[in-house]
Design a protein with these regions (language model features):
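Conserved alpha/beta-domain cores
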Residues: 1-17, 22-26, 30-34, 40-51, ...
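Glycine-rich phosphate-binding active-site loops on the catalytic face of alpha/beta enzymes
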Residues: 1-5, 54-77
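Long, charged amphipathic helices and adjacent flexible linkers at domain junctions
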Residues: 25, 83-118
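Flexible, glycine/charged-enriched surface loops at secondary-structure junctions
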Residues: 33, 68, 93-103, 127, ...
Length: 196
């Protein structure tokens, strides 16, 4: 990919891992892209190395893995998407416990609150974690922690809804703006029932 153009080939794996770790530490979405399953431009199956690279991006903590030429000019765009989805789903199902935990203490109140929310959800065995956000900040912070519980992020802002779709493990839902927590709680109940 792009790192391979800028760096010696042997440096790419560690630089990519370090970049992903740094982005997670600062709660920034990170997308691994370019030539992920490149052989699928002409072949219905990826190489083992490509499948491993895709899985390793997940295990390193990337929020998303993106295709480009494989689907825009490739002969097998649907197979490519299905293959990538299978690799990611299998890796998440069997290997998420290998994603390195964030060892640093939260640097902000928002970081401390989201970490506490994840810990409380685990201790209480909550069915899910819900957050309201206009900017997407709380959802972004929750995503970096890779919680075991599903996270639903409610927002009245459509651009924030779209932005949050980049965050790992976040299920964004659009709701009307509400000033009072009673209204917000009713929105959570209604939206969760609507979405199963």
């Amino acid at each position: 990919g792009d790192l391979g153009v800028e760096l010696p080939l042997e440096d790419v794996p560690l630089v990519q891992k370090n970049a992903i770790e740094l982005a997670r530490r600062w709660a920034k979405p990170v997308i691994v892209a370019t030539q992920v399953l490149e052989s699928m431009i002409d072949s219905p199956r990826p190489t083992r190395a490509e499948a491993s690279d895709c899985a390793n991006a997940v295990l390193d903590g990337a929020d998303a893995v993106m295709l480009s030429g494989e689907t825009s000019v490739g002969k097998y765009p649907i197979d490519t998407v299905k293959t990538m989805a299978r690799i990611i789903e299998s890796t998440e199902e069997h290997g998420l416990n290998r994603v390195p935990p964030l060892g640093s203490k939260p640097r902000t109140r928002g970081g401390a609150i989201t970490r506490a929310a994840v810990e409380i959800a685990d201790q209480l065995d909550a069915a899910c974690i819900c957050t309201f956000t206009q900017s997407g900040d709380s959802a972004r912070r929750l995503s970096r922690l890779r919680p075991k519980k599903p996270v639903f992020a409610f927002t009245p802002v459509e651009s924030t809804l779209n932005y949050m779709s980049l965050f790992w493990g976040i299920r964004p839902l659009l709701v009307e703006f509400a000033e009072h927590t009673d209204t917000m709680t009713a929105q959570v109940d209604r939206k969760l029932l609507e979405n199963g």
